[in-house]
A protein has these predicted regions:
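A conserved ligand/cofactor-binding region detector
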Residues: 1-762
């Protein structure tokens, strides 16, 4: 593997030719399209990863983020291009701002898939992603009257990373057949060969059918199928649309897999020698019955043989402990949309019933619901969790009945992140600091970061203060960016306490907000923090998730109250950034001091935001949940702030079903005061009574994710973190320990384990 040797002069000539004019005369958008074409040419010139066996990573989401800079880093031309533009009076960061972010994902699931594609290519593995080409993604988030509003988020331009291919399939449904078209995005490895992300679309999609906000005719499948990621499923039409959409994804994937295997010489009886399929969460589960259907109906294979073949090809990654996220679909939905799959599913269920006398493991239950995860577990050869605690919980409680049947299938693969995007691209200043001390070997072997934990730095105040200076620079950059793009003013000298992740009650943004109410009331009473605090949220709520939208409303109301209170604003600021996405994350994460990872213990499978923050020198404030457990083990008690009940305590409380939030409310004046503030005159003056009262009642009568039992411990942990922050040398050492121990969370390590234990591509 060799760094790209293209000279600055050669780059200049090629870019000038692509733009049709001198660099200095180009607009930022013209430079972006020119660089995009240059990068695509270079990526196509590189060899693709080869091998008899190929991985197909099927996922409903690929939250890939902007691609220009990441690709230039991987191709080895980033610094040369940056310098070339500067010499011609242009800024690469200004060029980057003109790039639209692909709307192909929502949260951690999609971001993980994107990191994995980067690492698969970097490690030289023969593996492609397969998904859908959503035109509008999830949605673009707006704030109106202190509430979330949604509108389409178009991203596909005439010049884009998408390359239209000749691959097209006829996808059958009950009442019609749709014709697909495959588009490819090149996936560049770091100084290595390339793979592809295959995205299927339809040429009959009609973007104009979207009406007010993001509403559209959910029954007009030929026009709407690939418009949105996760269409609103609060009604029957939306839920059936999900079936149509998922089947479109997997039927295309299955046909592509079989075609490529046959081209390489497979008899299809030996398909497992040519293809391994990673099912990323339950959305692609229908690939199992669809492959069986295609093998039996189009390739004349006997049913038992087809089941055997497919069972040796498919592996399943479980990403959740939440029962609601383990998809279950009524049989009638399949009858209405894809009746050809039902006989296959019934055969699969019948085989399970004849083998096991346990209704909890059946595929089709007594209520005629099809359990998608059950298909994956019975008819795949591997089931993995995504953090050590998560996998243990799957084995011991959530999937215990299956673990007893197939202990050999279960394994753990702790999630990881690509350091190319989340350090090299997002934080070049920190990258240069690290390189100065330990060289650049960490760019390929992240475990080399451990070399940072050396007296040369830890005992050297000058170097520790350089680390603090880098953090201060990133905070100033974030403050400037938010001012320019969102009109938000924050104090760069304050403590940046950040919680960025999709809005869900189990992630407990509501607990963070209650603490901020508590802090606001303390300041009003005269108890002021030594250093001002800026609490930053970034989160989208699913359009039909009412309580999640109420939590956003509460935070935005609190933001307005504090912003207009001259007594409090110098000491406390609450900010909810608009339309949180990868681009914003790349600005927020390097600037963070305290990383909020406060999910209810036992509910977060892993998390990857915690890893990105850690890598950039933030200190984690969190529960012993998900990958926080492994971060805790790596950095030790002194370099993380752990609070709250253990997963064992939480699981036991759920089993006993004896939790009453009102008891905690009555017993703790701080909880009562904070919760009552939600429906106080101040909040009602800027908020909507219906939303605020509904959230108040939800907390007081349900609090399903146990905000109140952890609240006191949470407040104490935050105050300890704020106090420790005042000792700048101590804090710099905490930062350094976190950075030095982050190497374990490289997605290169994760992918190496997937290949060693599951895929066996090498």
């Amino acid at each position: 593997m060799v760094e790209h040797t293209m000279t600055k002069e050669t780059l200049k000539n090629r870019l000038t030719a692509l733009c049709g004019k001198e660099i200095s005369a180009c607009s930022e958008k013209e430079l972006y399209t020119g660089l995009l074409s240059l990068v695509q040419e270079m990526a196509k010139d590189k060899e693709s990863n080869q091998g008899k066996k190929k991985l197909y990573y099927i996922s409903a989401e690929f939250l890939i983020g902007k691609l220009l800079s990441n690709n230039m880093i991987n191709l080895g031309i980033y610094d040369t291009v940056k310098n070339l533009l500067e010499e011609n009076g242009k800024s690469l960061s200004a060029v980057e701002e003109t790039e639209p972010e692909p709307s192909l994902g929502n949260g951690g699931l999609g971001r993980l898939a994107a990191c994995f594609l980067d690492s698969i290519a970097t490690l030289g593995l023969n593996g492609d992603g397969v998904g859908l080409n959503y035109h509008f993604g999830l949605f673009k988030q707006l704030f109106k009257d202190n509430k979330q509003a949604e509108e389409p988020n178009p991203w596909i331009e005439n010049t884009s990373w998408l390359t239209k291919t000749d691959v097209t399939y006829k996808i059958p449904y009950k009442n019609f057949t749709l014709t697909s078209r495959m588009y490819d995005i090149e996936v560049t490895g770091y100084n290595n060969r390339t793979n592809k992300l295959h995205l299927f679309d339809m040429e009959t999609v009609d973007e104009s059918i979207v009406e007010d906000g993001i509403s559209f005719d959910k029954t007009d499948i030929a026009k709407n199928l690939t418009l949105f990621l996760y269409p609103d499923d609060s009604d029957k039409e939306g839920r059936i649309l999900r079936i149509y959409q998922q089947y479109f994804m997997v039927s295309n994937a299955a046909r592509l897999i079989l075609d490529e295997a046959i081209t390489k010489g497979s008899t299809l009886y030996d398909l497992a020698d040519y293809a391994v399929i990673q099912i990323n969460d339950t959305h692609p589960t229908m690939v199992i019955p669809e492959l069986i259907r295609l093998l039996t109906t189009e390739h004349n294979m006997e049913m038992d043989d087809a089941i055997e073949v497919v069972s040796h090809c498919c592996a399943y990654t479980n990403h959740t402990i939440l029962a609601e996220a383990l998809e279950k679909w009524p049989v009638e939905f399949f009858k209405e949309a894809v009746p050809q799959l039902l006989p296959i599913m019934e055969v699969l269920d019948d085989k399970v019933r004849r083998k096991f006398d346990d209704p909890s493991v059946y595929i089709i239950d007594k209520n005629d619901l099809v359990h998608m995860a059950h298909i994956d577990i019975h008819y795949g050869f591997s089931v993995n969790g995504v953090a050590a605690l998560h996998t243990d919980i799957l084995k011991e409680t959530e999937l215990n009945n299956f673990y007893k049947l197939y202990p050999e299938k279960f394994n753990n693969k702790t999630n990881g992140i690509t350091f190319r995007r989340w350090l090299l691209h997002s934080n070049p200043e920190l990258t240069n600091f690290i390189t100065e001390f330990i060289g650049d070997g960490f760019k390929k072997d992240a475990e080399e970061l451990k070399k940072l934990d050396t007296p040369v730095i830890t005992k050297n105040l000058k170097q520790l203060y350089r680390l603090l200076d880098i953090k201060a620079q990133k905070k100033a950059e974030l403050a400037k960016y938010l001012e320019e793009t969102q009109g938000i003013t924050i104090n760069p000298d304050s403590i940046f306490d950040i919680q960025i992740k999709r809005l869900h009650e189990y992630k407990r943004q509501q607990m963070n907000a209650l603490y901020l109410i508590h802090k606001y009331l303390e300041i009003k009473k005269g108890k002021k923090p030594t250093t001002p605090i800026t609490a930053i949220f970034g989160a989208k709520a699913a359009p039909a998730y009412i309580i999640a939208k109420d939590i956003i409303h509460m935070i935005l109301c609190l933001q307005q109250i504090i912003d207009k209170d001259p007594e409090v604003k110098p000491y406390l600021n609450v900010v909810m950034v608009n339309n949180y996405n990868v681009t914003l994350a790349e600005k927020l994460i390097p600037a963070c001091d305290i990383s909020e990872q406060i999910s209810l213990a036992s509910k977060e499978a892993s998390g990857t935001g915690n890893m990105k923050f850690m890598l950039n020198g933030a200190v984690t404030l969190g529960t012993d949940d998900g990958a926080n457990v492994e971060i805790h083990e790596l950095v030790g008690d002194d370099n993380i702030y752990i609070f709250g009940d253990s997963s064992e305590t939480v699981i036991e409380r759920y089993k006993k079903a004896n939790y009453c939030s009102k008891d905690y409310y009555d017993a703790d004046p701080a909880i009562k005061e904070a919760v009552d503030f939600i429906i106080s005159k101040k909040m009602l003056a800027v908020g909507d009574k219906e939303n605020l009262e509904r959230l108040y009642k939800e907390l007081l009568t349900k609090d399903w994710f146990m905000t109140f039992p952890d609240f006191k411990s949470y407040c104490e942990a935050k105050e300890k973190a704020f106090a420790d922050y005042e000792d700048r040398t101590l804090w710099a050492r905490k930062m350094l320990v976190n950075i030095s121990q982050a190497g374990y969370f490289s997605s290169d390590r994760t992918i190496g384990e997937y290949d060693r234990d599951i895929w066996k591509l090498r």
